[in-house]
Every structure is written in C-alpha cells, then in structure tokens.
Amino acid sequence: YLLAFLLATLAVYLTWCVKKWGTIAGMVCLAFAMGIYQAYATVAIVLVLLYIIRQFVIEKLDFLEAVRKDLKYLGMLVGGAVLYAVILKITLIRYNITLPGYQGIGALGIMSLGQYKAALQKTLYHFRLILGMEHGVEKHVYSLLNAAALLLIGLILIYLLVRNQVYKKKMSMLASIAAVCLIPVGAYFINFTSPDVQYYTLMEMAVCLIYLLLIIMLLQLEWKTWISKILKGCGIFVLCGLVYYNVINSNIAYFNMNLSYHKSISIAEDVLQRIEQMDEFQNQHDKVVIMGDYN
C-alpha cells in the first residue's frame, strides 16, 4: 500500500519537474500504482487538484496559462489509467483468468446518470464519516477539529483570494474554488467507476491530503496583520490537536490489536496442545489447521 502511495505521488512529481519525458514517466508510475492498489490513483488526482489550487491562489496564474500548463497532468492521469487497463487486459489474456466481482472490480466502466448521482451521495457520506461528521458537526474532539480544519481552509482561501487579488480574475477564482470543492470527489473517485464499490478506511488515504492543503495555505500567511495572525494561530492549534488525537487513537488501536493477536495465539496454542494429546494424533509432523471464531 505504501509503495502504491509512493508511486502515485511520484507520478505527479515527475510530471511536474521533468520537462521532456515527465508525463510518460508519470503514466508508468501511475499504471504501476494502480496495479498494486487501484484506489490509490485517487492520491494522484487529489495532488493534481492541490497543485491547481496553488497555481491560481498562490502563483496567481491566468486561467488560460494554467490550463495550458495543466494539460500534461490530465494526460498523465488518463494515460496512466489506459496503460494500466492495457497491461491488465494482456495479463488476463496471458493467464486465461477473469477479474473477480470483489468491490465491483469486475464491473468498472461507464455508469448511468442515476448511478453517478448515487455515487456522489455515497462520496459525500463517506467524506463526512471519515472526518467524524456523519450526522453533522458532533460534540466530540475529532469532529470539532475536522470541522475547524475545513472552516479554516475556506476562510484562508477567501483571505488569499482577496489579498492576492485573484478575485479580479473571475475564471481563476472560480477554478480555485471548484478545485477545493472537488477534493472529496477526487478522493473517492473510484465510486464513479463502478456502482458496487464500497470504500473502507485503507482506500481513503487521499482524504488525508486535505491537511496538506491547510498546511500549504498556512505557509502563505505572515505574522503581520491581525487577520493572518488569527488564521495562522488557529490553523497551527487545529493541526497540533489532530496530530495529538490521532497519535493517542492509533496507540489505543494498536494496543487492542496486539491484545487480540496474543489472545488468538494463546487460544490456538491451547487447542493445538489438546489435539496433540488425542490418540488419533500419531505424527508430530502432521499439519494442523485451526479455523473458526470464538466469542
């Protein structure tokens, strides 16, 4: 999974920094990232959206100039997906196998208008769910911190649009706002490729990049005006709170997983010892398989 994440990130990086063959190198990296784990193509999509936001809000590029520069990213994303599909097709033919129906992987393709609407609703639901806001902003720490992070992204975006006079370039302003709003769609893009996809946490890595967007925006604020001081101070506080909460939460989760692991091993060893004491057990080299569940 980490290799797939790395390759998806590398695809965008190579497309950005290598002028001559960067797009082709990016296609190859993205194709292999999708080959390892399809869902992490969304990492590349969201990174491209972050770069578009940076172009308009921070670099203050004209709309048409940015479009000309960003066509290579579209080529990388489409080309990488096509290359992955070609390699997949060749592999299926070569080994005479078919794709399983798991997670809708065997039903990728164009969906109906109603299915796209359902995919959008599912996307917004899962986006709220992973941020702890399934039923709106709730009175617990994680939900409040994420709500504050989203609010700060919106406020800092407005502040930067005004400070950098991007609002005078209406197309650039609309494009930057649209890119921010499309981040959930980009992070859950697999929803729009098959109606049978069900997201789980491991597939939602791209959602974490919204915190990278907040960091990028905070770096543009200086400790000069009272507005920027308040926004930057609140942003640092929220990010520190999220880091602390997730560190504590992760340690609790891993502690419980470790306890569960040792409990499972202990039960398996106890069952194995009883099996070895049975008269039917003749050979110490017999293979024993322990399957089932316990309460």
Role assignments for model-derived ranges:
Residues 23, 220-249:
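Signature aromatic-anchored transmembrane alpha helix within multi-pass, membrane-resident enzymes
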Residues 112-119, 182-191, 207-222, 242-254, ...:
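C-terminal transmembrane-bundle signature of multipass membrane proteins
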